[in-house]
Amino acid sequence: MTTLAVLFSGGGRTVLNLLNKIEDGELNAKIVLAIASKNTISGIDILADRGLDIAIARQDMDTQEDANNKISAWLNEAKPDLILLCGYLSLLPIEPWMQGKVLNIHPALLPDFGGKGMYGMRVHEAVIAHQKATSGCTVHFVDEEYDHGPTILQETCEVSSEETPK
């Protein structure tokens, strides 16, 4: 069984999908650590209702450095097989033991429409603004840069001229 740590910054939809796959027996994994980027995001209650204990990286007065130190300690204690960035918006410092274990899902075909601040609806708006005929998603290993690192998988979809970001 693969042990997973998940980090999220929003509603937790990707983590919910993982939980469903695990519960349905489609994914032989266990989430051993769930980390919310800050204490105000909606996914905390949603995922807690599904039985996950949620660690909060950044409380009201914490700096990002404080949050990164907490995350590092939690990850070093849990030592998961894989660390999944499930809509996690901060840059995660990659420690040597984490190389090749941290994966990100990005809602575009990287390297296009990636980088700091390019997430969610912003990515889809950029795809439409650039009149791209195709878009898609990328799963990649994470390195020290936003939306960078070796690609694992890309899936494409057509974008019609009538398409909206939603």
Where do the language-model regions lie?
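One-carbon transfer enzymes
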Residues: 1-166
